[in-house]
UniProtKB/Swiss-Prot annotation:
GO cellular-component term (any): host cell mitochondrion
Region of interest (Functions as E2 signal peptide), residue spans: 279-300
Region Functions as E1 signal peptide, residue ranges: 563-582
Protein name: Structural polyprotein
Pfam families, A to Z: Rubella_Capsid, Rubella_E1, Rubella_E2
Keyword tags: Calcium, Capsid protein, Clathrin-mediated endocytosis of virus by host, Disulfide bond, Fusion of virus membrane with host endosomal membrane, Fusion of virus membrane with host membrane, Glycoprotein, Host cytoplasm, Host Golgi apparatus, Host membrane, Host mitochondrion, Host-virus interaction, Lipoprotein, Membrane, Metal-binding, Palmitate, Phosphoprotein, RNA-binding, T=4 icosahedral capsid protein, Transmembrane, Transmembrane helix, Viral attachment to host cell, Viral envelope protein, Viral penetration into host cytoplasm, Virion, Virus endocytosis by host, Virus entry into host cell
Site (Cleavage): A300, G301, G582, E583
Comment text on domains: Structural polyprotein: Contains two internal signal peptides that are necessary for directing translocation of the glycoproteins into the lumen of the endoplasmic reticulum.
Keyword Acetylation included in the entry's annotation: no
Compositionally biased spans, kind Basic and acidic residues: 70-87
PTM description: Structural polyprotein: Specific enzymatic cleavages in vivo yield mature proteins. Two signal peptidase-mediated cleavages within the polyprotein produce the structural proteins capsid, E2, and E1. The E2 signal peptide remains attached to the C-terminus of the capsid protein after cleavage by the signal peptidase. Another signal peptide at E2 C-terminus directs E1 to the ER, with a similar mechanism. Capsid is phosphorylated on Ser-46 by host. This phosphorylation negatively regulates capsid protein RNA-binding activity. Dephosphorylated by human PP1A.
Organism: Rubella virus (strain Cendehill) (RUBV)
Phosphoserine modified-residue sites: S46
Length: 1063
């Protein structure tokens, strides 16, 4: 019998050499025995010549790529076209001699298909041709006259640490199907053992597969399959190789190895290698059963228990009877959920579900087509005093033709009949005609509705809140359990630690005049077990448990190292510490650096910084509209920067003169004489052509008759005065702007929690401290931003633009959408238009307005002494070049990149019970603005006192907890002023500006005006889909990445199967 000791690579080497010697002896002994004639066949140099007559086309021919689905069969090369036509084979080529070189090089060998081909010169075969050459030498082990056994393909695996979790699969014929050819030194060539029967792996995988390695790291077994694991390096890259070992002994004994039925999980192995059976059906079934019980317990097993010794439930207030319309109502497909309208209505003598009569919640919308009356009334929903009322518009004329009603979520626009609307009612004395409740004016939310003064006659039909229902929740399926309020009826009076309970409130115990409610695990254990066996809970348990069981199986199968199971068990069972929180505290922290609060440990905002990916957008020099000029009490003969050097600054004049699109104008005021000789007015007309003949100038020359020459005072009326103005767009030498784009911007809030530094972001809003866990409600990140670093005359400042520019829209000409140079030498945008110069008198009413775009106004100013005058220049907007100017950057950017809209919310969970400090002094300067009993929250603001958190109450109703300092919040008010506010101790009166709704019957929100354009209250699914198209679109968009994620996980598991269960 074969030994059960695992086979190593050294044993495999020795066994293959023994096989080669036995094969040579067998062939030598069979050479003397007569054999039947057979056609000649070209043989390998390493085999005997007695097998030269072997038939290559018989049934013993090897079959490559069986069952592997490969299109090309590289295990056999097709015969040449000459052989296919003539049916002959070539004469075998002479066997070349091989001299042992310094580096072992493969010799030329025969392919078994007629002719010879060179062996690969670069080591292992790396292409189909070299693989076919290597596969051409496979002499059989058994008698050639007998039929060969069925060939089998085995799978080995390779993976590299340099390529991540990429597993390469190599399918090849096992070594017992043929003996490798021997070299002249008597050793077999490992490169020729590579005999794939599946897809060809890449070249570097083939090299790694044929890399010799004598170290065996471990031997693994699965069933009757044995694998040897090795790790080695190829060119500096570490590879792992999992090789399939033979299932039969190589010493001739055909007895198989015993199956691996034992499983050893201790950390050390005494003698035998550690073997693991892959699979955990028992663990899966046991986990499935436990999860079914746990999920059933979590979902429906734990029922809240109410103390039956408490006082009975108080009676419900009486409800009046309203007029009943005997129409049949159909339940809408999207209504009937547990919410505000989950109760019942009493209309006349009939009880109806609220979902059959009332539409969705007044804040949620989502109602369809329904009608309670005939075609003479329209229907409404009025929300007042925190309740919804079913209202009817009276005395409405019937429509001529029914008009289809288009419904949409949160919409108040409805179809109107074809006839004219009803006339307005002027007063409130009109009768509602049989209705039992009062009337009041209708106030529509939609501002475009001009119908006024109509009456809304409300039925005495009140909406009852749904009954209070509780549920139980637990953390990680372990005690303690908490009571969860599913639906709450305010008149029941359930409170948690003195705070009224709302849907979603979690509390260990609730108290009300009815008694106490809590979750008792002992009383519901049997019910939990029974519910776990039901079909729905078992299905839920299966859905929730299967992913965790798969993760467990993957971890167990992937951790095949020695001692991995024991280590994993220690980590899972001993390294888990369930969180235990003592108390939870919530407060707010302002966003200014240095703000601090107490929750219950001191928390201070140390600073705020931004992190982003920066892309340099280059640098540019902005345009600058510059103008200069001079007022001269004579007419100059040389109108230029050189000729006017005594009156005009030389440097600005030269810069403007050399600018782009220059505008230069010379005016002569009252020009009658100059230089002692008289000149006519035509001397300057038209366009100064006569003047330019005698005086060189490049400017426009224009007379200025009618303008006052009082600037040159103290002279007779025949004196003259000239005004010279020059303007152009120039590149300012001391103005540069560098653009930087900030993407993936996120805000990092630097907090100090009891002296422990902590940074929170939107991705990680938690701080784990020795005192407990702090969860911060941080505002969203600002998004993409553009930074303009402006350097004006050495004074550098940064301006920030929020959002990405719309370069294909209105921002096409902005500096951020232009291409800039790194050296700040390029001007942005197109060349500006030419400025327009205009001479304006000092008393001209035009000066009361502003210059237009691209205009420059020039006004002479009387000097302080004779023959001295000045010039006042006013420049308007930049015109076409507006967006290229620094002023545009200032107008479209801000110095503060982003300021959060409100304070940071802090939720602190302590590791042990802590008594939180509470302020007892009343708040100061509390102002209440809004309305009460109108369904909309009112604004409450003021200053909280010091000494701890202020648990603010307004007329006994809890509003929230606030740290010392200014607070702003919103609250629903149920009582009229005056309002008493307190922090749990002494109270104070607050100033209030609220709307009194008592004078009107139906105030607040009146929405959903519906006419009787349909004959029944049914809504089709197509109408519902049209009303919720954006939700369906959002769901479809979310389904796309979800499908991609599932496909990625499936692909990952498909490739990971090689590491979990190689076959």
């Amino acid at each position: 019998m074969a030994s059960t000791t695992p086979i190593t690579m050294e044993d495999l080497q020795k066994a293959l050499e023994a096989q080669s010697r036995a094969l040579r002896a067998e062939l030598a002994a069979g050479a003397s025995q007569p054999r039947r004639p057979r056609p000649p066949r070209q043989r390998d140099s390493s085999t005997s010549g007695d097998d030269s007559g072997r038939d290559s086309g018989g049934p013993r021919r090897r079959r490559g790529n069986r069952g592997r689905g490969q299109r090309k069969d590289w295990s056999r090369a097709p015969p040449p076209p000459e052989e296919r036509q003539e049916g002959r084979s070539q004469t075998p080529a002479p066997k070349p001699s091989r001299a042992p070189p310094q580096q072992p090089q493969p010799p030329r060998m025969q392919t078994g298909r007629g002719g010879s081909a060179p062996r690969p010169e670069l080591g292992p075969p790396t292409n189909p041709f070299q693989a076919a050459v290597a596969r051409g030498l496979r002499p059989p082990l058994h008698d050639p006259d007998t039929e060969a056994p069925t060939e089998a393909c085995v799978t080995s695996w390779l993976w590299s640490e340099g390529e991540g979790a990429v597993f390469y699969r190599v399918d090849l014929h096992f070594t017992n199907l043929g003996t490798p050819p021997l070299d002249e030194d008597g050793r077999w060539d490992p490169a020729l053992m590579y005999n794939p029967c599946g897809p060809e792996p890449p070249a570097h995988v083939v090299r790694a597969y044929n890399q010799p390695a004598g170290d065996v790291r471990g031997v693994w077994g699965k069933g009757e399959r044995t694998y040897a694991e090795q790790d080695f390096r190829v060119g500096g890259t570490r590879w792992h190789r999992l090789l399939r070992m033979p299932v039969r002994g190589l010493d001739g004994d055909s007895a198989p190895l015993p199956p691996h039925t034992t499983e050893r999980i201790e950390t050390r192995s005494a003698r035998h290698p550690w073997r693991i059976r892959f699979g955990a059906p028992q663990a899966f079934l046991a986990g499935l059963l436990l999860a079914a019980v746990a999920v059933g317990t979590a979902r429906a097993g734990l029922q809240p228990r109410v103390d039956m010794a408490a006082p009975p439930t108080p009676p419900q207030p009486p409800r009046a009877h309203g007029q009943h319309y005997g129409h049949h109502h159909h339940q809408l497909p999207f209504l009937g959920h547990d919410g505000h309208h989950g109760g019942t209505l009493r209309v006349g003598q009939h009880h109806r579900n609220a979902s059959d009569v009332l539409p969705g919640h007044w804040l949620q919308g989502g109602w369809g087509c329904y009608n309670l009356s005939d075609w003479h009334q329209g229907t409404h929903v009025c929300h007042t005093k925190h309740m919804d009322f079913w209202c009817v518009e009276h005395d409405r004329p019937p429509p001529a033709t029914p008009t289809p009603l288009t419904t949409a979520a949160n919409s108040i626009t409805a179809a109107t009949p074809a006839t004219a609307p009803a006339p307005c009612h002027a007063g409130l004395n009109d009768s509602c005609g049989g209705f039992l409740s009062g009337c009041g004016p209708m106030r529509l939310r939609h501002g475009a509705d001009t119908r006024c003064g109509r009456l809304i006659c409300g039925l005495s039909t009140t909406a009852q809140y749904p009954p209070t229902r509780f549920g139980c929740a637990m953390r990680w399926g372990l005690p303690p359990w908490e009571l969860v309020v599913l639906t709450a009826r305010p008149e029941d009076g359930w409170t948690c630690r003195g705070v009224p309970a709302h849907p979603g409130t979690r509390c260990p115990e609730l108290v009300s005049p009815m008694g106490r409610a809590t979750c008792s695990p002992a009383s519901a254990l049997w019910l939990a077990t029974a519910n776990a066996l039901s079909l729905d809970h078992a299905l839920a348990a299966f859905v929730l448990l299967v992913p965790w069981v798969l993760i467990f199986m993957v971890c167990r199968r992937a951790c095949r190292r020695r001692g991995a199971a024991a280590a994993l068990t220690a980590v899972v069972l001993q390294g888990y510490n369930p969180p235990a929180y003592g108390e939870e505290a919530f407060t707010y922290l302002c966003t200014a650096p240095g703000c601090a609060t107490q929750t219950p440990v001191p928390v201070r905002l140390a600073g705020v910084r931004f992190e982003s990916k920066i892309v340099d957008g280059g640098c540019f020099a902005p345009w600058d509209l510059e103008a200069t000029g001079a007022c001269i009490c004579e007419i100059p003969t040389d109108v230029s920067c050189e000729g006017l050097g005594a009156w005009v600054p030389t440097a600005p004049c030269a810069r403007i003169w050399n600018g782009t699109q220059r505008a230069c104008t010379f005016w002569a005021v009252n020009a009658y004489s100059s230089g002692g000789y008289a000149q006519l007015a035509s001397y300057f007309n038209p366009g100064g052509s006569y003047y330019k003949q005698y005086h060189p100038t490049a400017c426009e020359v224009e007379p200025a008759f009618g303008h006052s020459d009082a600037a040159c005072w103290g002279f007779p009326t025949d004196t003259v005065m000239s005004v010279f103005a020059l303007a152009s767009y120039v590149q300012h030498p001391h103005k540069t702007v560098r653009v930087k784009f900030h993407t993936e911007t996120r805000t990092v809030w630097q907090l100090s929690v009891a002296g422990v530094s902590c940074d929170v972001t939107t991705e990680h809003p938690f701080c784990n401290t020795p005192h407990g866990q702090l969860e911060v409600q941080v505002p969203p990140d600002p998004g993409d931003m553009v930074e303009y670093i402006m350097n004006y005359t050495g004074n550098q400042q940064s301006r920030w633009g929020l959002g990405s520019p719309n370069c294909h829209g209105p921002d096409w000409a902005s500096p951020v959408c232009q291409r800039h140079s790194p050296d700040c030498s390029r001007l942005v945008g197109a060349t500006p238009e030419r400025p327009r110069l205009r001479l304006v008198d000092a008393d001209d009413p035009l000066l009361r307005t502003a210059p237009g775009p691209g205009e420059v106004w020039v006004t002479p100013v009387i000097g302080s002494q004779a023959r001295k005058c000045g010039l006042h220049i006013r420049a308007g907007p930049y015109g076409h070049a507006t967006v290229e100017m620094p002023e545009w950057i200032h107008a479209h950017t801000t110095s503060d990149p982003w300021h959060p809209p409100g304070p940071l919310g802090l939720k602190f969970k302590t590791v042990r019970p802590v008594t939180l400090p509470r302020a007892l002094a009343p708040p100061r300067n509390v102002r209440v603005t809004g309305c009460y009993q109108c369904g909309t929250p009112a604004l409450v603001e003021g200053l909280a006192p010091g000494g701890g958190n202020c648990h603010l109450t307004v007329n006994g109703e809890d509003v929230g907890a606030f740290p010392p300092g200014k607070f702003v919040t919103a609250a629903l008010l149920n009582t009229p002023p005056p309002y008493q506010v307190s922090c749990g101790g002494e109270s104070d009166r607050a100033s209030a500006r609220v709307i009194d709704p008592a004078a009107q019957s139906f105030t607040g929100v009146v929405y959903g005006t519906h006419t009787t354009a349909v004959s029944e209250t049914r809504q089709t699914w197509a109408e519902w889909a049209a009303a919720h198209w954006w939700q369906l679109t959002l769901g479809a968009i979310c389904a796309l990445p979800l499908a991609g994620l599932l496909a990625c996980c499936a692909k990952c598991l498909y490739y990971l199967r090689g590491a979990i269960a190689p076959r």
